Curated annotation (Swiss-Prot):
Record-given protein name: Sulfur carrier protein FdhD
Cytoplasm found in the keyword field: yes
Broad class of the protein's primary localization: cytoplasm
One GO cellular component, as annotated: cytoplasm
Source organism superkingdom: Archaea
Function: Required for formate dehydrogenase (FDH) activity. Acts as a sulfur carrier protein that transfers sulfur from IscS to the molybdenum cofactor prior to its insertion into FDH.
Keyword vocabulary terms for this entry: Cytoplasm, Molybdenum cofactor biosynthesis
HAMAP family reported in the protein's UniProt record: FdhD
Aminoacyl-tRNA synthetase listed as a keyword: no
One of the protein's GO biological processes: Mo-molybdopterin cofactor biosynthetic process
Subcellular location: Cytoplasm
GO molecular function: sulfur carrier activity; sulfurtransferase activity
Gene, per the UniProt record: fdhD
SUPFAM superfamilies per the UniProt record, alphabetical: Cytidine deaminase-like
Amino acid sequence: MQVKRVKVFKIRNETEAVEDDFVAEEEPLEVRTCYDDCQTFAIIMRTPGNDKELVLGFLYSEGAIDTIDDVSSVSIKGDNVVEVRLNKPLKVKVREMIVNSSCGVCGRAFLYTLNILKCNTRVSRDVIFSLPEKLKENQEVFKITGGLHAAALFTTSGELNYLYEDVGRHNAVDKLIGRLLLERKIPASNYIMQVSGRLGYEIVSKGIKAGIPIICGISAPTSLAVDIAEEAGVTLIGFLRGNSFNIYTHKERVI
């Protein structure tokens, strides 16, 4: 269950009333990695659901795995524990912290993929204009709670392939990348990623590492996000609202 019913005091002008409302669930998820033995790799604050995709995407973004072939099995151990058995020793150090849902040091193992520079993917303005509304229409839990971020993957013709929601925008992107790993679609060189929030370094670096050539958001990018998108050959689009958007890098992909 991704929502929880709560009682709220609703204030309207000079009146107040007790009403039922719904809020998004947020719970800790322990990520265990196993080779010779098992150890806690991280604890992620997330919205329950699609935990397998979340953990795989997170491990990929952290540089702990390179492909799905590095993983022997993924096991759900109770409500809030996922155990990942690896085919080789862990590449990075175990995190000694809780990763909150907004993150702050995500993508620490990020290395951009040079093959994106050779990608000839193109998309029309009309398709770009259509993405925010398609994202909003398919955010089922957000419609109930108003409290979740989303990340979605679209084709260059505007067809929605996947959409994931989470209390943390970084988690939503990791779930998306985990799905791509499971379906062996990385690098995702023929797709567009649309996110519901701002475009910070962590979000953009995750998309770049997955080989996504066009990354869009409804809010602003940060300076570092612009820098890495430019260097990696990725088209970065911000302030995508209504009938306008800003292209910050590699305009040639938008026709």
